[in-house]
Amino acid sequence: MELERATELVEYLNKTLYIDGDRVIPNIKHQIIKLDGLSKLLVSGLIDNNSMELKKGHYAHENALTTVVPNRNSIFASIVYAVALSVVKRTGEKCQIALGTHMGDFDNKTQTGIYPDCSEEFRTALEHAFKIGNWDSDKVDYYAPYNITDKTGVLKDGIDSCEYFNLDFKEIYSRTNTSYAPIYVGFIDGNDMLERGVWLSDYKSGSSVERIESFIKLGLEDPLQYAEEDGTLVSWDFVKKYVT
C-alpha cells in the first residue's frame, strides 16, 4: 500500500507542482529498493505473515511495541547514505539526506518513546559511524528536521508547504495513508470513490490515532477516508469521537 501511494503521489506532484503561480517541472524521482528475504528473518507486527500480532492502541501504550521493527532506521539510513555517497561520486556535488523521525517516535527532551532508533542520540551516533567509515562523507549532510517537533508539527509543515507550492492540501493528504492496518476495498456498486478499488485507513492503530489527533489539534478535517476492518466506511466525526 505504501509503495502504491508513494508512486501515485510522486506522479501527481510531477504533473501539478507550481511555485509562485508558475508551473515548474520538479522531476521528483521515486525508486523502489527491494530487500527480498529480509522480512522472513525479522519479527514485528508490521511485517506481513509474521508470528507477532499487531496490537491496536496509542503509541503511549506498551502494546505499541509490536510495531517495532528491529534495527529499522539504521537499515534504511545505511542504504540511503550509500546512495548519497554514490551521487557525490557521480556529480561531484554535495548531497543531503533526511530522516523523517519526530518527537512522537521518541522524545529527545524526556528520553522516552517506543522507538529508540528515532532518537537524536542514535541519529548522531549513526552519522558518526557513517563519516568515519566512508570516503567523501564530508560531502553528505544527514539530518532529521522533525526531531524537535511532533506529528502535529510535521502536519503543519506539510500544510504550509502545500500553500507555498499552490497545492490543495486535501488533494495531497487524501493520497496518503498512515495506517499500520490499511484496508483494501474493491468495487462497491453505487460508490464512485470505490469503483476501481482503493486503500482505506483504519482508525485504531497507533499511527492512525496519532494522525487523527494531529488533524484535530489543527482544527482540520482529514480528507483521508477511514473504515472499519470489514471495509464499512466511517465518518470523520465518528473517527474524532473514537480518538478523543
Which residues does each predicted region cover?
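ATP-dependent adenylation/nucleotidyltransferase module used to activate substrates
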Residues: 1-169, 208
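Cys/His-rich Zn2+-binding cysteine-cluster or related metal-binding knuckle/ribbon modules and their
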Residues: 133, 148, 152, 161-201
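Iron-sulfur (Fe-S) cluster-binding segments and ferredoxin-like electron-carrier domains
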Residues: 183-200, 206-240
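NTP-binding/hydrolysis catalytic cores, primarily Walker-type P-loop NTPases
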Residues: 243-244
